[in-house]
Amino acid sequence: MTPDPSDCLAPTAFVDFDHPAVAGYARESAGGPGTDRERAVRLYYAVRDGIRYDPYLIDLSTKGLRASTVLENGRGWCVNKAVLLAAVCRAAGIPACMGYADVKNHLSTERLRQTMQTDVFYYHGYTSIFLDGRGVKATPAFNLSLCEKFRLRPLEFDGTEDSIYHPFDL
């Protein structure tokens, strides 16, 4: 079920784009004038590369899942980063909401598999951004420096095609 885009513009307990730090980050990262698509792409890369992926920092409290907390921490896991992307898009007037999927993570480390006791990531978070009359999926989880370290092809986002699952590797 696809939500009505107009329902994806308000702040929530998690998507707290009305927080001054989140609003400021959105203004800086959107890069000024441009189409919604151009600004959404800039916001995607700001979150993907400006917030470090950290699957060990999991705080499921309301405060721990807020976009403002993710921004304050400077790191987070897929759900955190997707929440922040939804928040900065909404702050820029671009409708965005959360999406979730169960994914088999072929990229995880032995330490992470032992911690989770599985290689299936339940409730993997991504952001659906409403552009040009439709939702486009974006996963800002793995930052560029992480991808380079593990020799993974980073997910690119152009605002026209879904960017949701990583290929195996380079």
Feature locations, PLM:
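Secondary-structure boundary elements
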Residues: 2-73
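A generic structural micro-environment signature
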Residues: 23, 28, 57-59, 76-77, ...
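Residue-level signal for well-ordered alpha-helical scaffold segments within enzymatic catalytic domains
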Residues: 45-49, 87, 91, 129
